[in-house]
Amino acid sequence: MSVKAFDLVPAVEREQVMGEKVRINIECIECCGQHLYLGTNDCFIHHFLLEEHTTAKGKLAFNAQKLLHKYLGLKKPVVELKAASALERLIVLCDSAITVVDMVTLEPVPTGGAKLKGVTAFCINENPVTGDAFCVEMAVVLARRRAVQICTVHEDRVQMLKEVTTPEQPCALSLDGYNICLALSTQYMILNYSTGASQDLFPYDCEERKPIVKRIGREEFLLAAPGGLGMFANAEGISQRAPVSWSENVIAAAVCFPYVVALDEGFVTVHSMLDQQLKQTLSFRDGQLLQDFEGKVVVASSKAVYMLVPLPLERQIQDLLASHRVEEALTLTEAAQRNIPKEKYQILHRRILQQAGFIQFGQLQFLEAKEHFRKGQLDVRELISLYPLLLPASSSFTRCHPPLHEFADLNHLTQGDQEKVQRFKRFLISYLHEVRSSDIANGFHEDVDTALLKLYAETSHESLLDLLASENACLLADSAPWLEKHHKYYALGLLYHYNGQDAAALQMWVKIVNGDLQDSTRPDLFEYVVDFLSFCSNLDLVWRHADWALQKDQKIGVQIFTKRPTSEERRGQLNADDVITYLQKHSQALLLYLEHLVLEKKLQKEKYHTHLAVLYAEKVLGLISRPSTSEEQLSAARQKLQRLLKESNLYRVQLLLGKIQDSELLLLERATLHGKLEEHDKALHVLVHQLKDSSAAEEYCSWASASQDSSYRQNLFHQLLSVYLDPDVPGGAQTVAAVDLLNRHAEVFDAVRVLKLLPEDWSLPLLRPFLCGAMRATVHARCTSQVALGLARAQNLQLLHDRLKYRGGPVLVSEKKGCQLCHNTFSEPDCACLPGGTPVHINCVAKKALDLPHENAHHSNHT
């Protein structure tokens, strides 16, 4: 696609070159700064001074002042001109010979050394390798020789350094460092004249079409290839850029980055080196020459000279953006980096990215737009401002000037298409959600969060609650009316809470729960309000709303008090006694709160335990008196009472006994209370003779002795056995229950005591399990004690051994030392030691040990 990259501006008019001579043609051109040199076919060199100026319309124009012209006296065309500005010399190719003239006077300069004649072409090394600032490196092609000569031009001489042979006669060449790019008769090649390495490129017929060899950068060349292609090649012979497709009849080419300019018989064409596309075509008749000089592009016909003035890259980029050619604009922007100072480029690049983002935004290409906004570090308020009423009224934002886009607002952009409106809103939601936690939003979090809240509210987005429940910068003055407008009352309560207005938040939520306001956002809002109050540090608010919550649902409402954290500051704590007093009119809530204090928080206060036990007892008695009570209800209530009576030791037992004394259904509870008073005989009497539940009696014994020693447990079971065997109670002794008790718990009883209690008429088989168990327990106890005694003796012996070991020193035994018992010497190292460390024979000690009982008996007979 086309873009205007250059303006064609006249530089030297026809009359300034030709004068009155009709047959004068321009053969070559050279430009050095403001100085322009022309070589003509009549062997003249013309020297012009080009001065730039800007017209009234802002266009660039040139004034050409002719300073001098010089006739070389050879009557041959001047074929080539090259300036050596450091030497103030002009190298001239005329009549197959190279001469050097002064750049100012155009007078020939004597050159000692090599005489360069028979030259068909030459080029200057723009990447010299000699390191001498006061000489120019040059490559020369000689007629009818398959060679290239490397020379240096000094102020007063021309010196040949090296001659490099080539496979064929060179037609054209270009030089960069040690690398010579050559157009031979049938092909292009690259030759390193330092190493001798060469690389064939591709075939080309020089007789059919004029070759083009153009250095375009460090170790890179542009070549005219068959098929109307401009090929790029580096020093290794590799093309790192795609070729450009130009005319078959191109006669010259130049490079003005990022463009390749080509000249044919009727046109100047401009291709991009970045995407190889044709960007501009300029009509130019009788074109003869095209050269680039230090960023300038000069094109000449046979009679006049023109300048191709590149338009500023920024203007080219803006033209591309105006045509919505985003990728081309971005590519050109990145290519411009090499020609623009770093800071200026960064500013330009960011702006172009932002503009590109808005173009793609308008085309609904949201992924690309988002990426360009991110890379361009867009002030997100530029985007928000397109959406009516999203920016807070207090925002000081004004749009960038010049503007980054052509849109007035979202309505202008969508033209009333509601589907597009929703797509644009979804994009902004996504984008704001990403940037609000990044550096992009620094400095204007209020604008971002407020806009995001408004979008969430009007689209009923699920993230509205997440935004308000987390850290945010939403402005209350702007956000509250918006939430109310869109009936987001629960969210409005969250906003009030975040801004420290808990009273307003609770008022809003209570209205929703009561049905005064319609908002189905949170079906469990009542539970949420209760939970909120349980964490609220403002006790005035807690007490103000507690009665409302308890009237709604006591079971849930009491959680205001039961879920309240204990780690809060003291000002946020509630006194338990005050809560109990407050809950007197809410019986279910009071019971739940006392359960919380006693069973969950494990508070060890008698009044709480007693109060809870009394409430449990009253509830059970109430259920008993109610005919409609189900068995499950009564059983559950009794289990709670029984559990508390057994596990707690803090309640007032006598008070509870008085409460349940008259109930014939609460015998198990009465027995438990007697047990708490250590009245085990009464408890067992109730269980055995009134409740008639032997299993309950045995469980009672196990429960009552659980934290006691074995003797206490044994006495309690003996007491139960005595109750079973008591013949004076109605019904007489309970033989079966007694036998079952003995057989099941044989290990608990003292068998001797039991046998004394049992009637003599009981048969032995009846008590066999008990007696076997008792015998087994006795034998086990005896064996266990013997094992323990043996272990103790072994341990004692080991300790004595260790003691002797650590107290005694080494025992010396030798053939000269005798045994203290038999007085014979030792013949081997084995020995025993008497107390004191005296060594003796082992057999002597054994014999002494056998004699000791006899001696002891003898002594005892005489005492």
From Swiss-Prot:
Keyword Cytoplasm: yes
CHCR repeat residue numbers: 564-729
Localization per record: Cytoplasm; Early endosome
Coiled coil: none
Stored InterPro entries: Clathrin_H-chain/VPS_repeat, CNH_dom, Vam6/VPS39/TRAP1, VPS39/TGF_beta_rcpt-assoc_1, VPS39/TGFA1_Znf
Subunit structure comment from the entry: Component of the putative class C core vacuole/endosome tethering (CORVET) complex.
Function (record text): Plays a role in the TGF-beta signaling pathway. Plays a role in vesicle-mediated protein trafficking of the endocytic membrane transport pathway. Believed to act as a component of the putative CORVET endosomal tethering complexes which is proposed to be involved in the Rab5-to-Rab7 endosome conversion probably implicating MON1A/B, and via binding SNAREs and SNARE complexes to mediate tethering and docking events during SNARE-mediated membrane fusion. The CORVET complex is proposed to function as a Rab5 effector to mediate early endosome fusion probably in specific endosome subpopulations.
Protein name: Transforming growth factor-beta receptor-associated protein 1 homolog
Source species of the chain: Danio rerio
Chain's gene name: tgfbrap1
